[in-house]
Amino acid sequence: MATLFGVALAPLFTALAQVESNNGQTSKNVYQITRQYVDDVNRISDNEAFLYEDRNDRSKSERMMEIYWLYYTQRYIDQTGRDPTWETLARIHNGGPDGWKKYGTKKYWRRVKNFLPGGEET
């Protein structure tokens, strides 16, 4: 999947990897995906199942994130009437289903934003 709700994912994946693990240099789990995150993805996924070890595989991790975002950005859309942005997705990744509205994820977003093209939103 190259985009999600019109949001290009490749630049966001790159930025998240930099913030979470210095692009894999400081952790085997590039995106710092937790067991709870994997369990949640397996619960909401219709036809895919992931193992905890799959967190160490970059492409499988990215697929888990896509599933997670597809599910939880719908809540964002329903509550705000707006399409998600890089900020929305990054904050959901960091703060869980309602991470987009948690104050504590704003600092995380500022760090991610620095690694995006032009340091800008979507």
Per-region residue spans from a language model:
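N-terminal secretory targeting signals
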Residues: 1-11, 117-122
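Solvent-exposed, acidic/flexible segments
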Residues: 5-9, 24-31, 54-62, 79-86, ...
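Short, functionally critical alpha-helical segments immediately adjacent to catalytic or ligand/cofactor-binding
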Residues: 8-24, 33, 65, 88-97
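A structural motif
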Residues: 12-13, 27-44
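Alpha-helical segment that forms one wall of the substrate-binding/catalytic cleft
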Residues: 40, 44-100, 113-117
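Long, amphipathic alpha-helical surface segments
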Residues: 103-122
